[in-house]
Structure formats: C-alpha cells, structure tokens
Design a protein with these regions (language model features):
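N-terminal secretory signal peptides that target proteins for export/translocation
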Residues: 1-3
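Bacterial N-terminal signal peptides
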Residues: 5-15
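Short, low-complexity N-terminal intrinsically disordered segments enriched in polar/charged residues
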Residues: 18-48, 164-179
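Short solvent-exposed beta->alpha transition segments
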Residues: 22-30, 36-40, 52-120, 204-234, ...
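Short helix-adjacent coil turns
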Residues: 42-54, 184, 190-194
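Surface-exposed, charged secondary-structure patches
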Residues: 67-144, 174, 232-278
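Short beta-strand edge/turn micro-motifs at domain boundaries
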Residues: 106, 110, 129-174, 252-281, ...
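Acidic, serine/threonine- and glycine-rich low-complexity intrinsically disordered segments
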Residues: 169-252
Length: 333
C-alpha cells in the first residue's frame, strides 16, 4: 500500500527560506521520541473520545474555542475504536526565524523536504504561522477499516501541543488508495475517462494525510488525472465552470462539483454531485428534480453506472440548506 511511509520514508532535511524540515531519520533521538510520544498521546485521546483531554493538550488560541474540534473527535472516535495505534512518521518543522508579514500578521510557512538522491519532494504549506518550532505526527489506527490521524503540533514552553488535527480514512469500500490509483490507470486504458477521473480523486483523498501536505507522488497522480480527464472535465467542475447536462425533457442541470463518497460503506463508492438550483422547493418537487438530475447524468455518461454503487445529489439554492437524495444505480432510470 502506498502510505505516508512510502511517500516520505527516506526524506532528509530540506530548507525553504527561513523554515527547515527534518524527518525522523535525520533528527535526534530526543526530538523523535518527543514528537512520537506527543502524537501517540493525542491519538489515544481521540480514540477514547476524550475531547477534554485533547483540549488540555492544545495550543491556547484553539483550546479556548474547541467546539468544532470536539465535534471532529466525536465523529472520529467510533471509527478508530479498538484499532492499534502506530506512529507512521514524524517531522520537525522549524520556523523559529520566520518573520511576520508586511501587515504584522503571522506569515505563511513552507517547509520543503527533498527525497534522498532524487528530485522528488514533499511540501508542508501552512498558512498564518507564528514563529516557532512545529512538528507533524502521522499516526495510523490499524484495524478492519484503518484510519490515519495526523497532528500539527507546536512547542509551547518546552511542551508539544496540538495546533491542528487531520483525521482521514485509509480505505473506501474496502480498498486503499493504491488500489484506486491502479484501477484508475486500468480505466484510462479502457477509455473509461469519467470513471478514471473520479477514481483518481478517491486515490488522492486516501493517500494524502492532510491538505497542507503535497508531494511529488501526489503531483504525479494529479498529472495523470488531468491528462486522462474527458474534455468536459479538463478545467474541473466549479460554480464558475459547471458541468451542464440536458435531461430527456430538455431541462438543463448545472452541476457545480463532482466527487466521491463512502459514507454508506457499500461494496463500491458513490458519486456525489452538487446541483445549482434557484429554489429548493417542497420535498416532493425537490426529490423529483434530484432523481431527474441523476438520470440525466447517467444518460449522458453511462459508463458511470459500472464503477459506483449509486449517486448522491445535493441541490443547493442560495441561502437555503442543501436538499440531498441518494439512490443506488439500479434505482435510477
């Protein structure tokens, strides 16, 4: 499996301006043990659903407003219950000499780590970072459905405290990121460009520990995805550049995003699509519109029926809550 271990196992110290990145193979035993101990302790608090305990280990500016993180802990704890916690990787990120921006506010920091004897690299790009010493700990919660618990940590008065929490599943529908990457390549060869584009998306979500990390391996994945994208997806799918699909009755459906989802834990992942609408409407009208949008999407791109369990449609109207509908492929006509 292509995990953070493969992405970064042979990283050595790299320099980007005033910031330095030291990986566990290059750091001192003292630093390595301290970072690993902090990461494990934080992961244990998450596993125990001990939000108060994790709050006590959090930097002051986040500890004082902990509600959002508490919710994430509560959602993650059941996913990692009973799992074995294993320290996968730790990094020492030193921004002690980082200067504030021209406006006096904390500057963005970029920590560049180069792979030994190659041009490959991994990047940590962290916005609005006060000068100081930071670390990043990746903890695997190994079980039937493994998760990766990653923590940005900052040294405060000699103690390592949490400055960011990034929980992510390592599998979807029973498969890991490398499986989806390999499957996407097979789909490209079979001219299934739509399925491949979405499988590449799932692969990246499973392989990347956190959005603030980029690597040459992930860049390679994205380049493959972009090269294989069907023309309608060459510029992505956004609110400014929606995917427009016509239904059998001539109605147009404007999709502002196209992605994947594993929340139902079926044997295949689901497609998710966000639909731009003017009004949500009453539930009966909204559901029919959503199911008609599903039908139009699959009629336009029938290959999507093969690679996925079903479709989620989220109809979004300005100032209103999204209206969601999910159907299995066999229920969409």
């Amino acid at each position: 499996m292509l995990t953070a271990r493969v992405l970064t196992a042979v990283l050595i110290c790299g320099v980007a301006g005033a910031e330095t990145c030291t990986t566990q193979s290059a750091m001192t035993d003292t630093d390595r043990n301290a970072l690993a101990s902090a990461g494990r302790a934080m992961a244990e608090k998450v596993q125990a659903n001990d939000a108060a305990g994790l709050q006590a280990m959090t930097i002051p500016e986040y500890a004082k407003d902990f509600g959002a993180i508490q919710g994430v802990v509560g959602n993650t704890a059941p996913k990692v219950k009973g799992a074995s916690l294993v320290i996968e990787q730790v990094y020492l990120l030193d921004a002690s000499d980082l200067k504030p921006g021209a406006d006096g506010k904390p500057a963005n920091a970029q920590f560049l780590c180069t792979l030994n004897r190659s041009i490959a690299a991994a990047d940590f790009s962290i916005p609005s970072v006060p000068a100081g010493k930071y670390g990043f700990a990746i903890v695997e919660a190994r079980g039937a459905a493994p998760w990766r618990l990653s923590f940005l940590i900052r040294q405060e008065q000699g103690k390592w405290q949490m400055a960011g929490f990034y929980p992510r599943p390592m599998t979807a529908a029973g498969h890991d990121g490398l499986w989806y990457w390999t499957a996407a390549r097979t789909m490209v060869k079979s001219k299934e460009q739509w399925n491949a584009w979405l499988y590449y998306q799932q692969a990246e979500a499973l392989l990347n520990p956190a959005a603030l990390i980029q690597s040459s391996h992930l860049e390679k994945l994205r380049n493959e995805q972009n090269a294989a994208a069907p023309p309608a997806l060459s510029s992505g799918v956004t609110a400014d550049a929606p995917l427009v699909v016509k239904g059998a009755d001539g109605a147009e459906y404007h999709f502002t995003s196209l992605g994947v989802d594993d929340s139902l834990a079926k044997d295949k992942i689901d497609i998710t699509a966000r639909l731009k609408v003017d009004q949500a409407g009453d539930p009966v009208v909204a559901r029919k519109r959503n199911t008609d949008a599903m039908s139009a999407l699959l009629a336009a791109y029938p290959e999507l029926r093969k690679g996925f369990h079903g479709v989620w449609i989220f109809a979004e109207a300005p100032g209103q809550n999204p209206y969601a509908t999910e159907l299995a492929m066999g229920e969409i006509h």
